[in-house]
Amino acid sequence: IQSRKYPPASEWNSISNPPYSYYLYYLYANIASLNNLRLKNNMNTFVLRPHCGEAGDPEHLISAFLTSYGISHGILLRKVPFIQYLYYLDQIGLAMSPLSNNALFLTYDKNPFYNFFKKGLNVSLSTDDPLQFSYTKEPLIEEYSVAAQIYKLSGVDMCELARNSCLQSGWEANIKKHWLGKNYMKGGVE
């Protein structure tokens, strides 16, 4: 007899919500099944990139590491170095939104974005709730402009962030190859 902590989704009858890991597993499993079907029909596939590590338990970051292509936010990685190291080793994409975090969770000067970038984690800049947190008509340009000014990012730094953004995107390989070059998966310089 196998005991389970949680029942299958079809048998969930608790008035409480299931934990984040439960939701994430079922999203992962269903997206994987859907992607298999889409591949057989020569269609593009989907990636799982949840909101994770902005608030909540650091355990969410472990669940996302095991199931996801990348995550949005990840600021809690600053509190759990061993999980941060796993994200570094596997180069799991972190689409970070320091301006959004500044309004809700963490002031800009305490945001780990730049620290993660200097350590070599696969970070990019993104927008989160641009209608709520942006002051311009170009919220992504705003994120890049503020980060460039605050952290004194060089042109090379900005190019690396843009490259990371392309790598993290859900675009097919031929699109990435067009924007990043035929050797875009190759590490180092030529």
Across the structure, where does each feature detected by a protein language model lie?
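Acidic (Asp/Glu)-rich catalytic clusters
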Residues: 38-41, 83-89, 116-120
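Divalent metal-coordination and catalytic microenvironments
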Residues: 51, 71, 94, 128, ...
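Short acidic/histidine-rich active-site segments
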Residues: 47-55, 121-139
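Divalent metal-binding pocket/active-site signature
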Residues: 1-80
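Mid-to-C-terminal alpha-helical segments outside catalytic/metal-binding sites
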Residues: 78, 146, 152-190
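Histidine/acidic-residue-rich catalytic or RNA/ligand-binding cores of hydrolases
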Residues: 56-67, 81-86, 104-114, 133-146
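Glycine-enriched alpha-helix->loop->beta-strand junction motifs that scaffold or abut catalytic
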Residues: 63-71, 88-94, 119-122
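Extended C-terminal subregions enriched in glycine
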Residues: 74-77, 92, 96-106, 135-138
